[in-house]
């Protein structure tokens, strides 16, 4: 009887999640919209007229663009200048590929420029969603504010976060995450995608199932967070869930 109940609950969970995924695919936004903006507008404008619009920045030598997202007053996206679909791309594990997370952290300055006053680093976070957890098929890192409750959890767990991957104490937004402390120096020279693929067992073979997030800690280091798709736990590996595009932290004062 107990086994039958567990099977029934599992089937209901799978059905609910399948319905959610099907809805996303049956009623999608254009999954190539970001790629069209980058390839058909930002890059030609920069090359022909030195005008990156609608992007805020096009850095051809470094291989990235920065675009203001339509959601939230301060959210920006960092994207490559060539075709990379997302976190599952083998290109992200090549030594020849730029360190997009480090570039995105440098690009946080656009948040302050848009706001007209400094956005403290403690309010900033970076995320990239998994293959199933995203709506766009052009690689993009979300540069946006951190949720206040997530900021509080990171502060409380700071001393428990080590330099090796380990489960984050408790959960974040109801989902399990791995956490790893990263220094600024390490972040500048080593891609978080490499850290995940080389240090978490079997991650290299299943990169598309993972979502990554990065946020600063109070002691000057960073915490790198990773969550893996778990359908029975309603987790699509959408670490953007840790962000608050309305930036309540800034309304509450300097975090």
Curated annotation (Swiss-Prot):
Belongs to the Cdh family. GO terms for biological process: CDP-diacylglycerol catabolic process; phospholipid biosynthetic process. One of its GO terms (cellular component) is plasma membrane. It is a single-pass membrane protein. The chain crosses the membrane at residues 5-27. Keywords: Cell inner membrane, Cell membrane, Hydrolase, Lipid biosynthesis, Lipid metabolism, Membrane, Phospholipid biosynthesis, Phospholipid metabolism, Transmembrane, Transmembrane helix. The keyword Lipid biosynthesis applies. This is CDP-diacylglycerol pyrophosphatase. It comes from Cronobacter sakazakii (strain ATCC BAA-894) (Enterobacter sakazakii). GO terms for molecular function: CDP-diacylglycerol diphosphatase activity. It comes from the Bacteria. Signal peptide: none annotated. Gene3D superfamilies: HIT family - CDH-like. It is found in: Cell inner membrane. The lineage of its organism: Bacteria, Pseudomonadati, Pseudomonadota, Gammaproteobacteria, Enterobacterales.
